[in-house]
Amino acid sequence: MRKLLAPIAAGALILSSLALAGPASAHNARSHEALAHLSGETHIPPGNPGAGSHSQNMHFRSTIGPTGFTNSDIAFQGRYAYVGNYGGFRVVDISDSDNPVVVANVSCFGPQNDISVYGDVLVVSVDSPLTSPACGSPPASPITLETAWEGVRIFDISDPSAPTFLTAVYTKCGSHTNTLIPDLNDDRLLVYVASYPLRAGPDCGPHDDATDTHNPLHEQISIVEIPLADPAAASLHSEPAIEVPTWDIHDHIGPNPAFNVMRGCHDLQANLGLGLMAAACAGVGQLWDISDPANPATTSPIWEVDRSEIDFYHSALFSDSGKTVIFGDEIIAGTCSTLADGDGQMWFHNRTDGALVSTFQIPRNQGSDYCSSHLFNNIPGVRGDVLVAAWYAGGTTVVDYSNRANPKEIAFYDPTGGSAWSSYWYNNFIYSNDIPLGFSIVHLSDPARAGADRLRYLNPQVQ
């Protein structure tokens, strides 16, 4: 279903390891990985990044190996990759693709440790009530405003080999993901925080106290302001309301008192040139006007899509031309064993009105493995439109969608025992952070990469 809402604008409680094994396995193994991701579980099966299947135009180059934690998102700046995991993050010198070097391994537990960088500033998301924002803090119990913290941590990375914790900002429902927008006119960074109350937090989700006035469904994002002159003075800027439908996980897994219904966003993809944001908000995908980034029009979306075939609007991307908005569906229960079912697809929409153009599913049968689109970005500057995507057990896929009506996989890398969380193109190579296998570098030799732009830095959630 598509709703055109306005003219186009110009220009969780962290779970201990395997805590969900009972509820998830009671449903089926296919949904376990999605529940683990949504709720913060850490489970590391074995695997081999150098083995498995790949297309003739994709070649494994190197890896720095696993961390012992769930590996998550990546940001890039210069010759460094900043590689998140639930236990902290690693800084990797990627100047030699055959011999990446870990120059810093920061131990700072806080799922998901979704990561963004700009200049000397690094931001990580913590979606898990801890006893304090300090690195080394354990999960909080009880979870109250007096005893628990979750939100964003901020580090100084002026010396990439020695990141230094600066400060932290509490945000309601924590921070599942973050989108860092430079607002250089005002000498600051604005960090959009997406979160949701799938599990209750200190002032997030259902509550028993009749005097508590917080909204149990959440229905907001948060914006954190970081002054460039003094990042340690970061603070909560605002809490813009959102208008999205209630998403009920029980529709997908059956009754389970461990999880809450909610209204919130998972990923926020910014296109700064267009002044737009594609908001993936569980039960709906929306397009927002962010031409004034400090005052986004979050309650009056330009359009929204809420297709019943989609389990969970998880992530988004604009084509380089700006003509197309892509939403990724993270399935809660499904596999790629029956490709015709279309579980976990990408959905391609017109940017101007939200009309559906096409969908894409990887063409490789993955049996009973959990298989779903996850995180992705474009290969910038090439002729046509080409993206790189992580597909959990489907590995890393390269998709040519120059013909929007007929997107096609043109390359893939699918390591044994892998489950790709994030896969991105950055300066001539593809970098994948795999849940069990860790960070790997892959080379794409396809002609579709010709002419790709080199970037000074990359936060994949910002274009």
What is each PLM-predicted segment?
Residues 26-463:
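Feature marking well-ordered beta-strand scaffolds used for ligand recognition
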Residues 2-26:
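Secretory targeting and sorting signals
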